Amino acid sequence: MGVVAEVWRSSVRLLTNSPQLNGGSHKSALWKWRFFSAQPKRTVMWTWVCGFMLFSLGVISLFTGHVVSHLEWYSQQLSKRSLLDMSRREPIDVWKSKYSKFFYGCSERGRNFLPAVQEQSSNGYLLIAASGGLNQQRTGITDAVVVARILNATLVVPELDHHSYWKDDSDFSDIFDVNWFISSLAKDVTIVKRVPDRVMRAMEKPPYTTRVPRKSTLEYYLDQVLPILTRRHVLQLTKFDYRLANDLDEDMQKLRCRVNYHALRFTKRIQSVGMKVVKRMRKMAKRFIAVHLRFEPDMLAFSGCDFGGGEKERAELAEIRKRWDTLPDLDPLEERKRGKCPLTPHEVGLMLRALGFTNDTYIYVASGEIYGGEKTLKPLRELFPNFYTKEMLANDELKPLLPYSSRLAAIDYIVSDESDVFITNNNGNMAKILAGRRRYMGHKRTIRPNAKKLSALFMDREKMEWQTFAKKVKSCQRGFMGDPDEFKPGRGEFHEYPQSCICQRPFSYDKTSTDDEEEDMSEENHNSTSPGHVHLSSADNERDEVFPD
């Protein structure tokens, strides 16, 4: 900046002191200069001075532009750092982060994002066969829209998986509002319900079918997939889940968000049942937590972990594992140490009580068929008597949906999304999808177990006092509570950490704005350190012999 300033001062001195510019010894004003003077020297000098001034201004703008941009960047970083440093030092408010109000979802189209290519001008029709359960298929549908955009293709409404473990024959329109899906994305991608008959009749061969590698890059689609599409005009991609790279440019990431958080809307029937369950929970309690218990037989078998059920459990889970040909043999103890085992319902209850949730907290349990049934759920019920499920709250409304696991999962999705706090016992697809959505919707409190550290605590909990255990749980859960400071670029799946779609408001710290929250929090923290509020008794020890941690 010293060099720039000196250049500027020199140019000013030249303008004010040059005898040539001031007409020799006369103090003539600049507006009185004669630009068409007969004196060639004055004309030459004026041209030189103008050029020098322009050069000086260019140099100044070059340097100051960088300085200003750097200062702005450092200012933003310091503001963000001060916010995050404060959040790390303060006690954990289990119900919400007071810094969440400074962040919001933003997925608007950029100025240079071109309109969708119309059907008649596209490179062909893209058929997508999604794979897995409801939320795994959701990732595939989201990425299918982006791939269609990359290929300049017309997307046919994706087909859902009818042959996986869940055996649900629901079609797209049975779960999602298909007309809204098509219309809301009309500016991004052209979507049709089916390939036109005239196109099918004109085809000499059936649609070309292939499966792309997982995490395929944009270049892969352009180099390997696009030539097939342009040649065959109709292309089907099968087993389409996580088939697109995590790292895309910002416009494409924002398109992912528009699909996942706005275009994929459940049908009115499903949405109505889900919101009835939410209203019935709200009628009983001002706020409630939703616990997603992924403790179904398929999850336990896939994990390769031991949950204390003895030889019977090992035989049953081993039989289920045969459905996956490529699963390796795993050491259950090593998997637990690595934090790869889903928490048991009992462990989830202990974690919640240690964090500060009291036994009068209302919980909604989102789950399918729990392995071990009521016996497995009993410890969680004892820790949280206000225990509810969709079957308990909307039994009559659910009857038409009972044969369809994906539609039932959609009800759990809605209630979990609307809850004040969302907790999961695993790192599965629903956990990731909802964690990302709740971040996008304002960093609503989302608790993910730090399974690696918690597993060691659960194994040693009988060796420590409850207060010590609770303190250690709080410590190891920092960074796993859904706070904004957990947001690190490049971390995890984009569906879980949609960083390109999160914007930040200016930060200001109001110490008096959270007095009521701190009172609630201090009461909860007091209760979490009281061993009389949890069942660490001989009854618990007996249960642990059946389901050891």
UniProtKB/Swiss-Prot annotation:
EC number of this enzyme: 2.4.1.-
Glycan-carrying positions: 152, 359, 527
Cystine pairings recorded for this chain: none
Family as reported in the entry's similarity comment: Belongs to the glycosyltransferase GT106 family.
GO terms, biological process: fucose metabolic process
UniProt topology in membrane: Single-pass type II membrane protein
Keywords: Carbohydrate metabolism, Fucose metabolism, Glycoprotein, Glycosyltransferase, Membrane, Signal-anchor, Transferase, Transmembrane, Transmembrane helix
Pathways involved: Glycan metabolism
Binding site for substrate: 292-294
Region (Disordered): 506-549
Molecular function (Gene Ontology), one example: glycosyltransferase activity
Transmembrane segments: 43-63
GO cellular component, one term: endosome
Intracellular or extracellular location(s): Membrane
Biased composition (Basic and acidic residues): 540-549
One Pfam family in the UniProt entry: O-FucT
Stretches assigned to coiled coil: none
Organism: Arabidopsis thaliana
Protein name in the entry: O-fucosyltransferase 29
